Structure formats: C-alpha cells, structure tokens
Design a protein with these regions (language model features):
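Transition segment at domain starts
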Residues: 1-17
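Gly-Asp-aromatic-enriched flexible segments
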Residues: 1-3, 32-34, 45, 103-106
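Short secondary-structure junctions
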Residues: 6, 29-34, 84-87
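N-terminal post-signal-peptidase region of extra-cytosolic proteins
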Residues: 6-9, 34-41, 74-76
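Mature extracytoplasmic domains of secretory-pathway proteins
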Residues: 14-65
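Helix-rich interaction surfaces within compact, conserved domain-sized segments
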Residues: 53-106
Length: 106
C-alpha cells in the first residue's frame, strides 16, 4: 500500500473472456513513484450499492521532487476481475488524491 496518486487521467474497463481488466492511468505529483496499484476501498473488495471502488496508489521515493513533464510522471495500474467478482457491480470507481473517475458496466 502506498499514498494516493495525484490525479486519475483515464479509466478503461476491458472485457476479456471470463471477466474484465480495469486499467487506470494517473498523473503523479512527483517523479519516481513506483509499485503503483489499484487498492480496493473495501477490505473484502465488494461493491457498495453497486459501486466497486479502488484507490490509485503508489510509493513515493524519499527524495521526490515535483519536476519533469507530465509524460515522465504518468503511471498505469491494472487489475483483473472475474465475472463472479463483477456480479452485482454497476459502476467501477477509481479515486486519486484530487479527483476520481467512474465507468458504468454495459
């Protein structure tokens, strides 16, 4: 577990046989953030009122500086879910420090 990434810039839900892949792109406030992941907001990774929520998090290096272009501060994290895990889910939400993005299941 890390600290929240500054912003979520893109959220894609890709259907695959047997489930889906959640892919979130984010922009960090500093360069060098590593071990970026989608962390479930609930301990058992279950939806609340049909909404499955994740936090886009990463580990900041100790001597991080807010320098560099947005390209050098862009990170991506993904998480695979089965159809069973997606049952009862109407919306997937990914939160960052300053914003959140949602995607409705079709």
């Amino acid at each position: 577990l890390g600290t929240p990434i500054d912003q979520v810039t893109n959220l894609v839900i890709e259907r695959v046989p047997g489930g889906a892949i959640i892919r979130a792109t984010g922009l960090t406030a500093v360069q060098g953030v590593f071990q970026v992941q989608l962390t479930p907001a609930t301990e058992d990774e279950t939806p609340v009122n049909g909404v499955l929520t994740y936090r886009l998090e990463g580990i900041r290096p100790p001597s991080a500086r807010a320098v560099g272009s947005t390209h050098t501060r862009t990170v991506v994290a993904a998480r695979a879910l089965t159809d069973q895990e997606l049952s009862g889910v109407r919306t997937i939400r990914v939160e960052a420090a300053r914003n959140a993005q949602t995607s409705r299941r079709r």
